[in-house]
């Protein structure tokens, strides 16, 4: 297991992150290692979750790409991603609705905070989840090891305190195929916080 960092990435990496590109392009860029390996679609549904403070627009390019490959793609349906009460229940219902509509399991793809949602949904909706893929998501380690903490607090209206029990719960991967795509040059999340523990059904790319 990688070390557990307590500090966010360097300010220089954060500056590079901010100037890299608009949200939509950045989301697609983060997904490129996975996109290069995606096989032609079989028509099964995929829900894509945006990062903190982002909306469905940020995942449009990724959804369009997956749609061209033959997957049935869906946005998360909740507008801008803010850590407010009721979000997880609404996400849960959307997975159930999409799975019921297609009569098939759903792949869950999440960027940043959206990936944390995807993992938790995969744990609670294993029967409806085909796989989980996260893009630069901080599901492992200390809540202080991200440059998005202040934004999270402002949008959620509450302080982001480190809770060891919650951290351990988030660290555990869903019991479905789970892939984490991360970058050591990530300016928002310390890359060590995006690593799955080694297991037959997990991988880090």
Annotate the PLM regions.
Residues 178, 200-205:
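Short, conserved active-site loop motifs that form the nucleotide-linked donor/cofactor pocket
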Residues 44-50, 55-57, 61, 67-177, ...:
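Serine-dependent carboxylesterase/thioesterase catalytic core
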Residues 1-47, 53-64, 69-71, 101:
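Flexible, membrane-associating and regulatory peripheral segments of lipid-active enzymes
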Residues 67, 184-202:
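Conserved loop-alpha-helix segment in the C-terminal half of the alpha/beta-hydrolase fold
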Residues 37-38, 169-172, 194-197:
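Short secondary-structure boundary/capping segments
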